Amino acid sequence: MQAKLWTARLVFFMAGIGITVWAIVIPYIKIRFHLGDGTLGLVLLAGGTGGIAVMPLAGMAVARWGSRNCIAGTALLMCLLLPALGAAPSPLVFTALLFIYGANFGALDVAVNAQGAVVEAMSGRLHMSGFHACYSLGTLASALVASLMLKLGGTVLMLCVFSATVVLAGLTQNFRLVPKSGDAPPTGQHFAWPNRRTLILGLCCYAAFMTEGACTDWSAIFLRFSRGMAIDAATLGYAAFAVMTALARLTGDRLAMRLGQPVVMRLGAALGVAGFALAVLVNSGIVGVVGFGLVGFGTGNMAPLLFSAAARVPGMAAHHSMPAVVAIGYAGFLTGPVMIGLVSSHFGLGSAFGVDAVLLGLAFFGARSVA
């Protein structure tokens, strides 16, 4: 059992590498092809759209072939696509590759969470927050390695090839995973509409992912232009969010076993609201950084709890409920920053963060769904 747990942690770590390198490639592509912000926004939409579009199909693939095989296939394809992204010769080719990469990463995300859910069920203990902590550690580690490599004169293509090599090395342990996760679909049943509980889980996940997208894209802008911090210092807002998210996930399973999953969910949503209130209502850059860190610590365990609950929805097969919840969450990450931008353009960025806080408040009342 320990071997399966550690290998599950490894594949979550690998997924963290995949999403971070994707994010790091983007600004270099913007510079290489002289893309404006509007054009870049449309290009980025391709990745998120691909991810959301493929998730229902990914659930069926997991049910048919097992998450272990799906992880192997999608991780191998990711290793091929990463160097291709770094070497894309034109914006059009990059957009097409990003759509494929987003679709493949969406399928990988469904597969690793399905594997996490079945390993958790086999162990009889909560592990999903710990798995997602490994994902967060993968993002932090790859960001640090990328920063060092690029600072020493490495190219984006070299970074992509190196990252693909690390993922390939991790795949050598894939045989230790559970071969079959998820129940096989009844004959002819390839799609099912989400039931009420799945929709509640999905909407809570939307709020959690919207928060992540908002802090990723807008925290530095808020601290720079609303709080007057220097541009390099303004990035501390997202750094605090990311580090505290990882810290929350490292302790989340023990808290959930001690206090209960709904209690941890409510505490997380409440801390997220408090963090946004602190950042918006106190006119201080340092306090803003603390506020975004509090948001990360509060919301860090929401997605793991929701994904774990999605695998246990009564009356709905896991290969239907899990992709539905993950897809709705991804929609929050994709559309949330856009919504923040639209509200900000009319009412200010502080008010826009208030919208996010309201959604977290609604998630507070949906916490019973994770029991």
PLM features: residue spans?
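Intracellular juxtamembrane helix-capping segments at the cytosolic ends
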Residues: 106-122, 301-314
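Helix-to-loop junctions at the C-terminal end of transmembrane segments
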Residues: 54-67, 150, 248-260, 344
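Helix-loop-helix hairpin linking two adjacent transmembrane segments in secondary transporters
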Residues: 130-178
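Structural signature of the two symmetry-related core transmembrane helices
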Residues: 69-83, 263-278
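Short amphipathic helix-loop junctions that connect adjacent transmembrane helices
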Residues: 24-38, 217-233
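Helix-breaking motifs and short loop linkers at transmembrane-helix boundaries and internal kinks
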Residues: 34, 66, 87-92, 228, ...
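Symmetry-related core transmembrane helices of the 12-TM Major Facilitator Superfamily/SLC fold
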Residues: 157-174, 351-369
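Conserved MFS/SLC helix-loop-helix module at the cytosolic interface between two early adjacent transmembrane helices
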Residues: 53-92
